[in-house]
Amino acid sequence: MELWYTEQHTEDVRFSIKVDNQLYSGQSEFQRIDVFESKEFGKFFTLDGLMMVTEKDEFIYHDMITHIPMATNPKIKNVLVIGAGDGGTVRELTRYETIENIDMVEIDKLVVDICKEYLPQTASKLEDPRVHIYYEDGLKFVRTKENEYDLIIVDSTDPFGPGEGLFTKEFYGNCFKALKEDGILVNQHESPYYASYAKSMKRAHKRIKEFFPICKVYQAHIPTYPSGHWLFGFASKKYDPIEDLNSEAWNALGLQTKYYNTDLHMGCFALPNYVKELLEKEEE
């Protein structure tokens, strides 16, 4: 009998992957966690039936959420990562020797434990001595911080369930306060393609714009995320991700990446017209 993992992207659209084995299924205090194995995408893990990470395409997401801000300001030393229980974002950050401290805040310890066991590809650097993991609510954690971080990466789930508070006006205001005067905020910004995701994207963008003088959106193609067309938000008190891109300094680091490069950095901020229109329209 064939086994298929199926995820509902809209009322009328579903996405399926043929599964060889289910490696883990469990319920934490916050959410259901499943790990599957497939021929096409390798091992992948889901939360409450929604795709988070696959071994085959995780490099795209983690490259784009990490290297865009790092190439804009290669002097970043102190980083806060909210969410990111799979460890992929932290893995990419630890490649920068100039980063001195990475605080990672993940609400669900079981996510981290499961990813360490089944997804060492992404969780391999969580033991780095610069990494400090806090198992608590990111919304509450950031409330207590002021003028502390050079970069905050919000690597959250979608805006419901445990990740809901990470899309609120209060949260973005606290992120602004927690950043230094030249700080950068990067977040996963949902997809513009299906209406329900586009609504969340517009709301997040509007709220971030209320606090940050520089507020841009960039894109990547992530095959296993709804529609494949995924957005990220870049907000800063000082740096423009295009004008301040330091290609020479970043390329001199000699980092080998599978998706990101500094040409792509320039291009990913060039958005299709329908996305521009969505961002320009005020959220109803």
Swiss-Prot record:
GO CC, alphabetical: cytosol
Function: Catalyzes the irreversible transfer of a propylamine group from the amino donor S-adenosylmethioninamine (decarboxy-AdoMet) to putrescine (1,4-diaminobutane) to yield spermidine.
Gene Ontology biological-process annotations: spermidine biosynthetic process
Superkingdom of the source species: Bacteria
Enzyme Commission number(s): 2.5.1.16
Pfam families: Spermine_synt_N, Spermine_synth
Keywords tagged on the record: Cytoplasm, Polyamine biosynthesis, Spermidine biosynthesis, Transferase
Pathway note: Amine and polyamine biosynthesis; spermidine biosynthesis; spermidine from putrescine: step 1/1
Protein name according to UniProt: Polyamine aminopropyltransferase
Native source organism of the sequence: Alkaliphilus oremlandii (strain OhILAs) (Clostridium oremlandii (strain OhILAs))
Catalytic residues (positions): 155
Annotated compartments: Cytoplasm
CDD domains found in the cross-reference section: AdoMet_MTases (cd02440)
Self-association and partners: Homodimer or homotetramer.
Reactions catalysed: S-adenosyl 3-(methylsulfanyl)propylamine + putrescine = S-methyl-5'-thioadenosine + spermidine + H(+)
Binding site for S-methyl-5'-thioadenosine: 31, 106, 137-138, 162
Major site of localization recorded for this protein: cytoplasm
PANTHER family membership: SPERMIDINE SYNTHASE, SPERMIDINE/SPERMINE SYNTHASE
PROSITE patterns in UniProt: PABS_2
Segments forming domain PABS: 2-237
Residue pairs linked by disulfide bridges in the UniProt entry: none
Molecular-function annotations in GO: spermidine synthase activity
Similarity field: Belongs to the spermidine/spermine synthase family.
Residue numbers binding spermidine: 62, 86, 155-158
